[in-house]
């Protein structure tokens, strides 16, 4: 789980920059549109929409933007016809990578994602080539300053139904099953922990050690994928030493 936590922390630090560029709101809006399109506009009966709205609120997305995104998803107001696509491939050092996108032009996006992989020494593969390496888990990122007692947090999280707790220098990640994710998140929030990010994500079952030049190439590949306008989420199974990770990120 450590490799996942490292990448989760890097992405968490990038969130402020993404917000400044406006990409964060665009990502959140697309997720709400897709969730409403497939499950309806009522968050009480659509767990995916409820989670997307929670993320949007945590990012201080205006209420009007959220409501418009829901209506675009349900077709109440006109909007771009988006669809979800997942791309899979390998990066330098044999790192498995999954990329989830929301696009209005699959052909354009596929060509651009392939170019990014190739540019950084990776290759885009067929559907299913790396999906088996990952499993769905709930990920709850907590601001470490809001944690007064780490042992108490671990106890609270496990009692709420969490599977694991990963503690790093500046954040804490609580791992749950997809089924218990919402309940654990709500309980921890009620107990006063400051949750900065919460989502159902994909966690690698095994990690690939990456060092030296390959580590730099992998991070540049991941960062360019993250910066692409159509990309919603990225997942990878690299394990890069902390000292290299800090110097490159």
UniProtKB/Swiss-Prot annotation:
One matching Pfam family: TACO1_YebC_N
GO cellular component: cytosol
Localization terms from the record: Cytoplasm
One Gene Ontology term of the molecular function aspect: DNA binding
Matching InterPro entries: Integrase-like_N, TACO1_YebC-like_2nd/3rd_dom, TACO1_YebC_N, Transcrip_reg_TACO1-like, Transcrip_reg_TACO1-like_dom3, YebC-like
Keywords: Cytoplasm, DNA-binding, Transcription, Transcription regulation
BP term (GO), one: regulation of DNA-templated transcription
Main location: cytoplasm
PANTHER family, sorted: TRANSCRIPTIONAL REGULATORY PROTEIN YEBC-RELATED, TRANSLATIONAL ACTIVATOR OF CYTOCHROME C OXIDASE 1
Similarity field: Belongs to the TACO1 family.
Protein name: Probable transcriptional regulatory protein Dtur_1615
